[in-house]
């Protein structure tokens, strides 16, 4: 598992989310934003344009619902232990699979926060989700819950930001050697990347 932060860092993030959920009287949070999933678990995928959600309930249960093509990515980049697959085929409705998870977590009649502002939650999927949860639970838009928590950086995050800034400075120094009239952007980008590989 290629996690970029310590177990303690991820534990602290989860605790902060749970505290925020408790303050807002949210029994569970459905994360659809890739950046939220990454921040909480390390899960990194290009599959964020498809329906996938990370469910976190007040008890700390964490379940990812995703497509089969993203299974290995979830296993190899995150600390998520419970990964469920929905079958991506004509006529399938992943919100049916999600509802099974919500039933397992005893969330019927509870209050669920949803990250509606997300690339993977298209208008059509949001409509399906709302229809699926109608008369099942109460829902609220909680698109900013994790975003607000991410604003305050931890010591580990500040260390990464400083390292990233130093790397950006090194790459910029390299750019000036090649940036001139008529220069190929591909060549400039290649030299920038090459300079970072040799560090």
Where are these regions (language model features)?
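Terminal domain-start leader segments
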Residues: 1-61, 173
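Structural motif
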Residues: 32-34, 66-68, 114-119
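Compact, glycine/acidic-enriched structural inserts
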Residues: 65-89
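Non-catalytic accessory segments adjacent to catalytic cores
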Residues: 92-147
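Active-site pocket-lining segments that scaffold enzyme catalytic pockets across diverse folds
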Residues: 165-175, 185
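Short, charged, surface-exposed loops that flank catalytic or proteolytic processing sites
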Residues: 180-188
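Conserved small/polar residues in nucleotide/adenosyl-binding loops
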Residues: 197-199
